[in-house]
């Protein structure tokens, strides 16, 4: 199953499926420490494939990771609703 399919499955879980969410977090992200939790929905263009989570990371609803390259989130990080983490850029020259 691809990371995008796992992300879709994560976003479709019921609130009572906490064990399933924990399992999918371990599968979606390249690295996920202990006690990580992301409130669905979660969005990433690579499904979290380039995201590294430290220990005890919490993200509220609507986390978006533009993970075209690696994103590192350190231990004991808490994020509010609708946070965007973007590693991509566009050409900066007007030419």
Please annotate each region the language model reported.
Residues 25, 38, 71-73:
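Weak global preference for isoleucine
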Residues 30, 34-44, 48:
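N-terminal start-of-domain structural block
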């Amino acid at each position: 199953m691809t990371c995008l399919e796992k992300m879709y499955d994560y976003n479709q879980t019921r609130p009572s499926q906490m064990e399933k969410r924990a399992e999918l977090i371990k599968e979606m992200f390249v690295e996920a420490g202990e006690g990580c939790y992301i409130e669905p929905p979660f969005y990433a263009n690579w499904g979290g494939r380039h995201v590294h989570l430290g220990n005890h990371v919490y993200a509220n609803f609507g986390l978006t990771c533009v993970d075209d390259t690696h994103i590192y989130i350190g231990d004991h990080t808490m994020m509010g609703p609708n946070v965007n983490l973007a590693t991509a850029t566009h050409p900066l020259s007007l030419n």
